[in-house]
């Protein structure tokens, strides 16, 4: 048994991570299940919503672990989650961006912290229910992150932060499967969560009212301010600049005779600039905090396909290195509502080249 590889299964209580645990156990790994406690629902002023980290989720994960006859633990990472994810989420909104906290959770919690926990317990791999694939390049030896075989479920966009060490010690057993097959396996195993709904994207804001969450969490109040047009003329009043994101049309409460969209925000002046949809299109962006996966670094311009938001189809582009580790991404065609704080992820076929944060 000592030579049998060991796997720590990150179990959310959902069907995907449960089937991932099932598959690893079937493959002969020494398995241990663990659920992360990232926050207390009562601390966020929320109850009655389906979120991860709920008592029901922990119960479901524990039940599946019991069925699989594997040890199970709940790990308390509430302090780390507050510092690394929630505070960055709030600061990104307060400085005019639109964050993607799922990426930071993957970076700091699901892989960094969980891999350390696995090693402390003599386990070799972290296993999650993400839809993506990992392979090693036979020529370079680098570990590659690849898209899931079934594109509609692919989650490689939110996994671009994984390091070479993390990729070498991570397994995604669902990368070649579709959702119906996964639910069928859960039914076969008689798991209690075989038909459980998928969790919310932002688990700690289950009602979608992120400004309400920020006000409760910080004790701040985000004041009203002016809507202005692209010439600087005041055209109305808004209810706090943090409430609006680039490209937004709904919920502005403006009647200007033609549709207008959020084009920019000045957080110091608390103004929100609105204009016609044509103002939203641009061909270039600059990104920082870049993580390269298929290459060690970018030294020359490279042709790629790029995604500047999760649900966007990949677009042909050229990426160029800039000083201080930043990159410029120039799209072949203008892109709508590129937004600070979101991720841009670069692809070469089904391989993730790398990704970073839009500045």
Predicted regions located by residue number:
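ATP-dependent adenylation/nucleotidyltransferase module used to activate substrates
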Residues: 1-160, 171, 180-181
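AMP-forming adenylation/ATP pyrophosphatase catalytic core
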Residues: 127-134, 138-139, 144-359
């Amino acid at each position: 048994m000592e030579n049998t590889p060991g796997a720590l299964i990150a179990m959310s209580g959902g069907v995907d991570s449960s089937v991932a645990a099932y598959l690893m156990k079937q493959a002969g790994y020494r398995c241990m299940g663990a659920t992360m406690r990232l926050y207390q629902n009562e601390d966020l002023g929320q109850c009655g919503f389906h979120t991860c980290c709920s008592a029901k989720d922990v119960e479901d994960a524990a039940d599946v672990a019991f069925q699989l006859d594997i040890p199970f633990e709940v790990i308390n990472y509430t302090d780390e989650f507050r510092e690394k994810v929630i505070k960055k989420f709030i600061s990104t909104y307060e400085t005019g961006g639109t964050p993607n906290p799922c990426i930071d959770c993957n970076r700091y919690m699901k892989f960094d912290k969980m891999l350390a926990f696995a090693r402390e317990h003599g386990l070799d791999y972290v296993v999650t229910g993400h839809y993506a694939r990992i392979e090693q390049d036979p020529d370079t030896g680098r570990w590659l992150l690849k898209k899931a075989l079934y594109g509609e479920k692919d989650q490689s966009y939110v996994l671009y932060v994984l390091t070479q060490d993390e990729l070498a010690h991570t397994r995604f057993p669902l990368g070649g499967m579709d959702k119906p097959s996964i639910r069928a396996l859960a039914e076969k195993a008689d798991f209690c969560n075989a038909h459980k709904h998928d969790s919310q994207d932002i688990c700690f804001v289950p009602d979608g009212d992120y400004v309400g969450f920020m006000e409760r969490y910080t004790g701040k109040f985000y004041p009203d301010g002016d809507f202005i047009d692209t010439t600087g003329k005041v055209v109305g009043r808004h209810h706090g600049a943090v409430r609006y994101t680039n490209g937004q049309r709904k919920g502005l409460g403006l009647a200007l005779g033609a549709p207008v969209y959020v084009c920019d925000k000045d957080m110091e002046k608390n103004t929100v600039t609105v204009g016609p949809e044509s103002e939203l299109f641009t061909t270039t962006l600059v990104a920082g905090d870049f993580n390269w996966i298929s290459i060690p670094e970018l030294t020359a311009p490279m042709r790629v396909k790029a995604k500047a938001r999760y649900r966007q189809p990949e677009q042909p582009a050229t990426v160029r290195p800039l000083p201080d580790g930043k990159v410029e991404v120039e799209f072949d065609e203008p892109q709508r509502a590129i937004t600070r704080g979101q991720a841009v992820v670069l692809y070469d076929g089904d391989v993730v080249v790398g990704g970073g944060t839009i500045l």
